Amino acid sequence: MQNFGKVAVLMGGFSSEREISLDSGTAILNALKSKGIDAYAFDPKETPLSELKAQGFQTAFNILHGTYGEDGAVQGALELLGIPYTGSGVAASAIGMDKYRCKLIWQALGLPVPEFAVLHDDTDFDAVEEKLGLPMFVKPAAEGSSVGVVKVKGKGRLKSVYEELKHLQGEIIAERFIGGGEYSCPVLNGKGLPGIHIIPATEFYDYEAKYNRNDTIYQCPSEDLTEAEESLMRELAVRGAQAIGAESCVRVDFLKDTDGKLYLLEINTLPGMTSHSLVPKSAAVTGVGFADLCIEILKTAHVG
């Protein structure tokens, strides 16, 4: 096996997704140790990143979610320290964390995305409701794990929802509702893995459904995707990742409308690795267990 030296599993951090990161990090740490890797937990909230060099770490497995963890900040710090790290680089991480600018790039390249609008204090909210229709989704551009996602159903409600959310990270986006199914497709080392059909018990795949409930259904392989649709989803996931320069292991989320058209929703450049997480479920279908998946991701560690 490749010699990775002393490995820091970067977990925890400062964002609203801290607890999820700790869960993922603990699972990864245990998996790496089970494979004989000299791995240790490292929480930047408790210990400055500058200590990585002082403590003799040679590789970083980054599973920091949210602000500072997957927005290019920690990636830049690791570049300066010269420590190879997993996940995407600085630019791709920053773009992937910004749903608005990621959508602009996908749209410019002809990839299918739901119609959307950016909201500001002086937005004509009635016009946005008329353009996108109801219901619609409203979300902050730079939060993950469905933090702050609201389904707006009632006419005249858009402005008040915007006021509730505008303190969150990044622009606030209104997005056309796509009334079909929810899916996700991981990409590992530039190769699309089996798509997952997500059937939440809640109204949509929100934070509660992702992390706190056991009745969300994950179908992998999906029972309602044709072979052609599955192939297209993988192709679109790979193209979506390549469009922003994302690498290592990412996950692209999709919606499928009632006519069967697929839409790219967003990309996660550092997908979760908890017991509820989607990437391990997809990899398992291909015969890759959790510990082996962690090793495959660790092999992608890079600088530059």
Curated annotation (Swiss-Prot):
InterPro entries: ATP-grasp (IPR011761), ATP_grasp_subdomain_1 (IPR013815), D-Ala_lig_Van_CS (IPR000291), D_ala_D_ala (IPR005905), Dala_Dala_lig_C (IPR011095), Dala_Dala_lig_N (IPR011127), PreATP-grasp_dom_sf (IPR016185). Residues 103-299 form the ATP-grasp domain. Its cofactor is Mg(2+); Mn(2+). PROSITE patterns: ATP_GRASP, DALA_DALA_LIGASE_1, DALA_DALA_LIGASE_2. Its main location: cytoplasm. Keywords: ATP-binding, Cell shape, Cell wall biogenesis/degradation, Cytoplasm, Ligase, Magnesium, Manganese, Metal-binding, Nucleotide-binding, Peptidoglycan synthesis. It is found in: Cytoplasm. SUPFAM superfamilies: Glutathione synthetase ATP-binding domain-like, PreATP-grasp domain. Its EC number is 6.3.2.4. One of its GO terms (biological process) is cell wall organization. NCBIfam families: D_ala_D_alaTIGR, PRK01372.1. Cell wall formation. This is D-alanine--D-alanine ligase.
